Amino acid sequence: MHQITEAHARELAKQAQRKDDLRAAIESDLVGVHRILFEAGCGHGHWLTDFAEANPETLCVGIDLISWRIRKGNDKKAKRGLKNLHFYKAELGEFLEVLPKSISFERTVLLFPDPWPKARHHRRRMVQPGFLSEVAGRTDRGGEFCFRSDDRPYYDWTVECLNEHAEWQVDESAPWPYESETYFQSLMDE
């Protein structure tokens, strides 16, 4: 018989509470919604806030693991009075688990994720076959996965992963959905 430690039991309880809280927030915020623009790893929300402001007809959702980034995104949302934008502190798997199946992605955006440049760390990269399958499973027919990286090896890795995936086709000539400098791009300019 296997037993879990008290610390592990506490962690499982925290995870369950986090999912319950996330589910309640999503159910409250996304009533009657069927399609969203989704940004995984939205950081401070700069790009998504600008996009939402320029595209008020599109419902935008961003997730990130770091609480203060989500707070900054929500501050930007409030300052601009945007009703079509929501930020959630969530891990991708938990978000997809609690997101109602009736909601699909018209577009998924992934901007400048950590490239994990050392070969032994590549398994930590966000773009992996499993990630692409999960996102494809929630994406509308004709939906897009938009990716940018300032790390050429990671960009090439992503193109290779997409080319090898049955659900995605790479179109490097497709126009970018919206140009707006991200927080991390602005750091590079300094």
For the regions a protein language model found, what residue spans apply to each?
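Conserved SAM-binding loop
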Residues: 73
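Conserved beta-strand signature within the Rossmann-like core of class I S-adenosyl-L-methionine
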Residues: 142-149
